[in-house]
Amino acid sequence: MCIRDSFAAALPMLVAQILNLLYNIVDRIYIARIPHIGTAALGAVGLCFPLVVIITAFANLFGSGGAPLFSISRGQKRNKQAVHIMNTSFTMVCFSAVVLMLIGLLFARPLLILFGASKDALVYAFPYMMIYLIGTLPSMIAIGMNPFINAQGYSTIGMFSVAIGAVANLLLDPFFIFALGFGVRGAAIATVISQCLSASFVLFFLTKKAELKVRFLHKNELSESLGYAKNIISLGTAGFIMQLTNGLVSIVCNNVLSVTGGDIYISVMTIVSSVRQLVETPIYAMNEGGSPILSYNYGARRPARVRKAMVVMSAMILCYTAVMWSVIIFAPGTLIRVFSSDPSLVKDSIPALNQYFAAFIFMDLQYIGQTVFKSLNKKKHAIFFSLLRKVFIVIPLTYFMPYVLHMGTSGVFLAEPVSNVIGGSFCFITMLCTVLPELRRMDNCD
């Protein structure tokens, strides 16, 4: 894997991830500019972020969990097994989407209160959440099955499937929010329509055009698929836990901020989270672009190419993050004003952003380690490090620093860099100490 190959693999993924980011980011940009209620509505919609994370986490549990196994099987020339893995993932994606939608619709209000919503915030958050939930199935199909398009070498098609929905959302948002006067509800409607368009294209391609085509599992295949399902869930659990704990951290942060800073700091956290999504998107793209290459060459027993892919992917990610970290530290207002022009909100967001991203480059080490572990089917390592940083470091610190050390809202934002340094370093060092010796042994055996 040379630098050219890395860019070739990562570029379509980068464009796809940026376009996918538009689903939520564009909503927030437009919502923040609704006259008179923009700042309050922005915070309220930010309270729905854990729900979006949960839906995405389940989609990736089966999609990103299945795609590396799919790639490994293709690398081993076992196409029949690869198709069975993809069909198993697809069936699980659809079933879980229906279950999540029903649970969400039944318990939307208590969930939002759990997420930290005040009575005022519920006015905007509840209708947005109810409409968004209707699009759970198309959302999960678009997210969960797109990795199988990329894993077959159709990365440009994968990018296009995301582009369809993202561009539609970009155009429909102002129409429903401002032209029709639907406000927050309009943003949710536009998102659901856009997700339906993306899902339709993904299904069309995977059922009609792809080399290896997808379908629902037949009844007589269910028992045989249990083994594949367990492996998919085992491998996808690391990313699932990482995303799910992102939602848990968001809930904890919003609850602490609502006490220490009030509703305005929910809006501040929404902006900080939005900037993080914006900055992380190319990192995700580079990881996802490199993951099939790592998996394929590992399955084909080509350790030299696995090592080279690891080095190139790591170098690209670290260089990019160094540039973005400089922008965040030295020009934070530029990024914040993308999401809101409210002077008081911008003023409160600048120190919060600087604190939150103080040691962000260490987070790269976590991402690189997680991607390598996942791509090489190292389930236990991937799951452990998913849990370590979020559950055992950042969440306790989010309570400890504001309440015990009396740091107020600053304690919430500073919990992130402390966890980045500890968790990221530990994950990366462990990856080097476990994966590199295995690759050397593979060299010797061959």
Short names for language-model regions:
Residues R4-I37, P50-G65, L69, C94-M101, ...:
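N-terminal transmembrane alpha-helices
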Residues T39-P50, A125-M129, A188, G261-L278, ...:
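Small-residue hotspots at the loop-to-helix junctions and early N-terminal turns
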Residues M1-A10, F70-G135, G181-G236, L294-A359, ...:
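Short alpha-helical transmembrane segments in multi-pass integral membrane proteins
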